[in-house]
Swiss-Prot record:
Gene that this sequence comes from: rsmH
One cellular component (GO) term of this entry: cytoplasm
Binding-site residues, S-adenosyl-L-methionine: 32-34, 51, 78, 99, 106
Family designation: Belongs to the methyltransferase superfamily. RsmH family.
The keyword Protease is annotated on this UniProt entry: no
UniProt enzyme class: transferase
Region (Disordered): 271-293
Name the record gives this protein: Ribosomal RNA small subunit methyltransferase H
Organism: Persephonella marina (strain DSM 14350 / EX-H1)
Length: 293
């Protein structure tokens, strides 16, 4: 079986390898891919892993078992990163990592993140929260749907897609990923249906962001992550679409103006050809890194 490394793993390690302090926070621990490599390569490190997703935490616990006693996994949102770290009687940390992508295993969990299979419209990272993709698709007004698809998906056919969703749900509730993907597919002009990226990709992204309140949480989490860093500490954020990247870029720019950080990546680092070939979903990843001063 081929071992799949987490996205931009070499680049992430290169920034964290000279960290002097003890504590690193993986604010989006997922299945534990980045955490595993950090623990393996930084033997003095104690890692705090945060995730909303119970299933992710189970996978991470299993993955990180060789490093028993050197990590702690906590269920929570990275917007509460400060509260979580302080609850462990830790004031400052040496490194913070955010990987904002949806984990590969989440795409395979039959929770509606993917339109490759017939799945219920769910998309919740935290299974205990009430709002699901089903609620967004079946209860939001046409204007609300158009706004989120346009703003969060940067989808040029947002108005047509919103109208098609509202028309379709008049006949019956839209219950599965395949149903929603087909509605979006049918809206697209035929010449644009055959591209490398499925027509429904941006709409699914938009609905997932809405369900999980992702953009607000990124703003809050990244700012708090910077505040937690000791002098010389490193923050690294991997984003997967322009909305996320813009938020991170603007936060870094503002915190640099306030003389809180030095930006270490003048332009975001992106995967090389080899990594994209081995792991196609990594193609849109962008890594931005800064150091606390």
């Amino acid at each position: 079986m081929v071992e799949h490394y987490p996205v931009l793993h070499r680049e992430v390690l290169s920034f964290f390898k000279n960290i002097k302090g003890r504590y690193i926070v993986d604010a989006t621990v997922g299945g534990g891919g980045h955490s595993f490599l950090l623990l393996k390569n930084l033997p003095e490190t104690f890692l705090i892993g945060i995730d909303k997703d119970d299933y992710a935490l189970e996978k991470a616990e299993e993955k990180l078992s060789p490093f028993k006693g050197r990590f702690r996994l906590i269920k929570g949102s990275f917007k509460d990163i400060d509260t979580i770290v302080h609850s462990m009687d830790i004031k400052y940390v040496s490194g913070v990592l955010f990987d904002l992508g949806v984990s590969t295993f989440q795409l395979k969990t039959e929770r509606g993140f993917s339109f490759q299979r017939e799945e219920p419209l769910d998309m919740r990272m935290d299974r205990t929260q009430k709002k699901t993709a089903f609620d967004v698709v079946n209860r939001y007004t046409k204007i609300e749907l158009e706004k989120i698809i346009k703003d969060y998906g940067e989808e040029k056919f947002a108005r047509r897609i919103a109208s098609a969703i509202v028309e379709a749900r008049k006949k019956k509730r839209i219950e599965t990923t395949k149903e929603l993907a087909q509605i979006v597919y049918n809206v697209y002009p035929p010449p644009l249906r055959r591209g490398r990226i499925h027509p429904a990709t941006k709409t699914f992204q938009a609905i997932r962001i809405e369900v999980n309140n992702e953009l607000e949480e990124i703003k809050e989490g990244v700012n708090k992550g910077i505040d937690l860093l000791e002098k010389g500490g490193i923050i690294a954020v991997i984003s997967f679409h322009s909305l996320e990247d813009r938020i991170v870029k603007n936060i870094y720019r503002e915190r640099k103006r306030l003389k809180d950080i030095e930006i270490l990546t003048k332009k975001p680092i992106t995967p090389g050809t080899e990594e994209i070939r081995e792991n196609p979903p990594s193609r849109s990843a962008k890594l931005r890194v800064a150091k606390r001063i």
